[in-house]
């Protein structure tokens, strides 16, 4: 049984997004925290199946006047992944390497790919991504870019800029 009657925002998102559209208290509670001490209940969560759905969710949230936060692994220690608007979680479906150019040492990835997973795939080609956050088994590239993450190798290899 639903926690409450669906809002117009929830109804529209559910109609236009095939990925998960979460407005129940349990799901919202899971997204109300990250690795920080902040706890902010979001209005809703969207887990898009592809980038078109992510863009659609963003447009719907904008039409409704909601703030939006992109979320990956939720490993932020400063509360960047929590808000009282709409959270778009990229970690479930948008987590692949889209292209890899070994010769030029470049790749294009989706925002939800986990750093350790990326490096496992790059290692097969003698490559690696040198930003070494302590949460590499859970941190996503999108979240790392949003935070300008760095690590012990940042003096030599730089940050996410």
Task: Give the role of each language-model region.
Residues 1-35, 41, 60-68:
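N-terminal accessory segments
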Residues 13, 36-68, 86, 90-133, ...:
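N-terminal glycine-rich flavin-associated loop
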Residues 26, 134-136:
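Active-site beta-loop-alpha junctions enriched in small/polar residues
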Residues 35-36, 77-82:
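Short glycine-biased active-site loop of nucleotidyltransferases that positions the nucleotide triphosphate
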Residues 71:
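Conserved PLP cofactor-binding pocket of PLP-dependent enzymes
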Residues 138-142:
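Beta-rich nucleic-acid/ligand-interaction surfaces
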């Amino acid at each position: 049984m639903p926690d409450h009657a669906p809002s117009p925002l929830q109804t529209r998102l559910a109609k236009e997004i095939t990925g998960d559209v979460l407005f129940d208290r349990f799901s919202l509670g899971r997204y109300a925290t990250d690795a920080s001490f902040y706890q902010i209940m979001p209005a809703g969560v969207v887990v898009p199946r592809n980038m078109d759905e992510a863009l659609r969710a963003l447009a719907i949230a904008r039409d409704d006047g909601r703030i939006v936060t992109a979320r990956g692994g939720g490993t932020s220690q400063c509360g960047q992944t929590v808000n009282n608007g709409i959270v778009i979680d990229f970690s479930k479906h948008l987590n692949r390497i889209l292209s890899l150019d070994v010769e030029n040492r470049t790749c294009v990835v989706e925002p939800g790919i986990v750093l350790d997973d990326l490096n496992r795939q790059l290692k097969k080609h003698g490559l690696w991504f040198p930003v070494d956050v302590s949460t590499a088994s859970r941190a996503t590239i999108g979240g790392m870019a949003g935070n300008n993450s760095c690590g012990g190798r940042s003096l030599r290899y730089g940050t996410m800029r």
